[in-house]
Amino acid sequence: MTSRSERLLRLIALFCFGAVGIALISQHVFDMPPCAWCVMQRLIYLAIGIVALVGGFGGGRALTRVCGALSALLAAAGVVAAWYQYSVAAKMLSCDQTFADRFMSGTGLDGAVPWLFGIYATCMDAVVSVLGIEYALWSLALFVIVFFMALPVVFGRGRA
């Protein structure tokens, strides 16, 4: 029988992988090229998803709590990234000297997996509204939801 914490982590993984899937559909079907901060958020979503899957299908309460804590920390990093994209980077003519651009280029992921991590737009050009709300704010909202979903995993009581 799975615990509530394991089910929460599995749901977190589903949300995060779903967010990346939606981002890829936006990019490849609706021709919305991503900026450096967009692809960095994809990386954070994938990291959360993997960590959450390990905790959701791994064994033991300690591993589940550690994975919950890592998920919460990564979600907090995602909140910062999405907020920076919305409040600062989206108003810059170029984001080629920001942390996200240097980090993504430095990892080599943009060249190794360009269909997923390729940087094809400036942050200003990548500003898109969906249902009247900027894409970065949707991402920020999901990171906040994931953060609060991970907290009961970390601080909850034993196996329930």
Provide a role label for each language-model segment.
Residues 1-45:
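Transmembrane alpha-helical insertion/packing segments
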Residues 2-14, 58-79, 148:
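Interfacial segments of alpha-helical transmembrane regions
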Residues 15-22, 48-51, 55, 74-84, ...:
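Membrane-embedded alpha-helical transmembrane segments of multi-pass integral membrane proteins
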Residues 22-27, 77-92, 109:
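C-terminal TM-helix exit segments that contain a strictly Trp-centered aromatic cap at the helix terminus
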Residues 28-74:
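Alpha-helical transmembrane segments and their immediate interhelical/interface regions
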Residues 29, 58, 87-88, 155-156:
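Helix-loop junctions at the membrane-solvent interface of multi-pass transporters
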Residues 89-134:
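Extracytosolic (periplasmic/ER-lumenal) interhelical loops and adjacent juxtamembrane/interface segments
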Residues 118-160:
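A hydrophobic membrane-anchoring alpha-helix module
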